[in-house]
């Protein structure tokens, strides 16, 4: 008998059935498929193999929460997630399709680099308060409208 009694037991959380207690952590930016097309198939396959290997849930890695204040490294343009028939949405959906094909739950890791964001143009660090970081970089304060974008 395993000393991890429940590791391989299914469980239900908020109506979603996890086939076991194993969750694959993210390993690469989800948005890498947008900006490094030459590695896209390898990234999709890496994520798919985790689902195929038996994980109950698989993360795709970071995807920025918005295209203004929530930009992140390697983001060369805005990602359009509003057009469900558009290429950007299809590229993210490809992760979910490959993961779900093997019976695992797919999830995205949303990211917002906040006050520690990259400072090279077009990146600007945004945080809960305005201040100057130790490295001399100005951090701008998010306003209520900016914060509400995450809840849309």
Stretches with model-predicted labels:
Residues 1-152:
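Flavin-dependent oxidoreductase catalytic cores
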């Amino acid at each position: 008998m395993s000393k991890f009694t429940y590791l391989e037991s299914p469980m239900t959380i908020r109506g979603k059935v996890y086939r076991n207690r194993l969750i694959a952590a993210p390993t690469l930016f989800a948005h890498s498929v947008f900006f490094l097309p030459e590695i896209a198939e390898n990234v999709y396959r890496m994520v798919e193999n985790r689902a195929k290997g038996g994980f109950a849930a698989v993360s795709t890695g970071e995807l920025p929460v918005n295209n203004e204040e929530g930009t992140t490294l390697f983001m060369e343009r805005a990602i359009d997630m509003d057009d469900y028939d558009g290429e950007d949405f299809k590229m993210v959906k490809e992760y979910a399709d490959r993961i779900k094909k093997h019976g695992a739950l797919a999830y995205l890791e949303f990211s917002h680099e906040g006050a520690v964001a990259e400072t090279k143009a077009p990146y600007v660090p945004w945080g809960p308060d305005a201040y100057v970081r130790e490295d001399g970089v100005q951090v701008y304060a998010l306003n209520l409208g900016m914060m509400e974008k995450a809840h849309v």
